[in-house]
Amino acid sequence: MKSLRPPMGPPPPVSDVRLKTNIQRIGTAAHNLPLYAFSYLDEEGVYEGVMAQDVMNVMPAAVVVGEDGYYRVKYDMLGIEFRRIA
């Protein structure tokens, strides 16, 4: 019997501003959302993406709250790519 539950993939990336540092606006993404370069507080590397708090104002359905209480963005709903840039 086929499952009615959608396939479970990895959780969306944590995009909560409370977990980011060295935040610099680098442009504007789809839906007129600010695009940022940033680092996470607990790891090395620089990433490019959006802030969940910004997305909530434009497309709240694209933001979920993880079990940890932090906001995550469903980038596929926005047509924006989350990526590591350094």
Where are these regions (language model features)?
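C-terminal intramolecular chaperone/autoprocessing and neck/assembly modules of extracellular spikes
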Residues: K2-A86
